[in-house]
Every structure is written in structure tokens, then in C-alpha cells.
UniProtKB/Swiss-Prot annotation:
<comment type="subunit">
    <text>Binds to type II regulatory subunits (RII).</text>
</comment>
<dbReference type="GO" id="GO:0034237">
    <property type="term" value="F:protein kinase A regulatory subunit binding"/>
</dbReference>
<feature type="region of interest" description="RII-binding">
    <location>
        <begin position="35"/>
        <end position="52"/>
    </location>
</feature>
<dbReference type="InterPro" id="IPR053084">
    <property type="entry name" value="AKAP"/>
</dbReference>
<keyword id="KW-0963">Cytoplasm</keyword>
<feature type="compositionally biased region" description="Polar residues">
    <location>
        <begin position="19"/>
        <end position="29"/>
    </location>
</feature>
<feature type="region of interest" description="Disordered">
    <location>
        <begin position="1"/>
        <end position="29"/>
    </location>
</feature>
<dbReference type="Pfam" id="PF14469">
    <property type="entry name" value="AKAP28"/>
</dbReference>
<dbReference type="InterPro" id="IPR025663">
    <property type="entry name" value="AKAP_28"/>
</dbReference>
<dbReference type="GO" id="GO:0005952">
    <property type="term" value="C:cAMP-dependent protein kinase complex"/>
</dbReference>
<feature type="compositionally biased region" description="Polar residues">
    <location>
        <begin position="1"/>
        <end position="11"/>
    </location>
</feature>
<protein>
    <recommendedName>
        <fullName>A-kinase anchor protein 14</fullName>
    </recommendedName>
</protein>
<comment type="function">
    <text>Binds to type II regulatory subunits of protein kinase A and anchors/targets them.</text>
</comment>
<dbReference type="GO" id="GO:0005930">
    <property type="term" value="C:axoneme"/>
</dbReference>
Amino acid sequence: MSETQNSTSQKAMDEDNKAASQTMPNTQDKNYEDELTQVALALVEDVINYAVKIVEEERNPLKNIKWMTHGEFTVEKGLKQIDEYFSKCVSKKCWAHGVEFVERKDLIHSFLYIYYVHWSISTADLPVARISAGTYFTMKVSKTKPPDAPIVVSYVGDHQALVHRPGMVRFRENWQKNLTDAKYSFMESFPFLFNRV
């Protein structure tokens, strides 16, 4: 009887080993090694990209201000806060900007206060800039939120569709520079239209 049990046990062990060898990948297989290398390289690349992002954010942290609450909001305070935001975010002092209130939209659940920021840069060639770029700011004041809740602020550049939020996206001065450069190039292409006095 012990021989029968041993042979039955041996058969069961052989079947288990065979099943395990079928489910476990063969490490000698070249395809498996290639796939493993690709996965490892992708993982290493992701880790390096994440580390670079962390280092860049430490060198250039996102700059933001403490935005006012619903109870503190006025149109004038909105103008001041946008000025304060840009004084903190814009590093080059050659940019001149002006903020103006555009309109208030009454929605069912909130009010949207829209501001426009004009950007221009003076150069030695053109001490008075003829071209400006712009950024639209929207301050959303909810009718239902408590007075101590912060307002929602977003902005979008001239001729852009992507909406940005202060503190979540870094404001980049080169957006404005690229737009003003493109406008200057366009004006230089058609001098007969733009050189009128």
C-alpha cells in the first residue's frame, strides 16, 4: 500500500510541477527577456521624468497668492488681486500690463466676473508698443457657497482654448512674448496696412 501511495503522490507532484512550469514564464525565453527589458526601461524612464519634474518644481515653484473669499469679493479687489498675482509670477520687469474689468455675467448658480489683462513690451526700437497680447481672467463667485469659501479663478490667453488655474499651472511669460512676436511679424509682412499715420 505504501508503494501505491508513493506512486500516487509522485504522480500528483509531477502534475503540479508540469502545471506550474506551464504557467510560469520561461526565463530562458528570449521574447520574455525582451519584454522584461522594455518594461524595465519604461519604468526607469518614468522615474527619471518624475524626478526631473520634482527638481524643476523645487527650482521654480508654482507661484500663487491667497485669493479672496466670496464674502470679501468686489470688482476693485479683483483688479488688485490680479495685479498682485502678476507681480509675483512675472519675473521680467520689462513687461508692462494693465488690468481692466470687462463684464459681469449672471448665471443660474453664480456670477462670472471677467477681466482683461493687456501685455506689452517696450524695446529700444519701439519705446511705445503698438502691439499687445492679452489674458482673460474669470473670477467665479457662487451664489450658494458660504462667504468664507474661496472664489474660483481661471485664465485663458488670447487666441487660446486651454483654461488655466493659478497655482495649478505656471504662468509663462513666453506665451505673451510668442503672441506679440507673431503679431509684429504679421505687421511687418503687410506694412502698407499698418504704417498709416
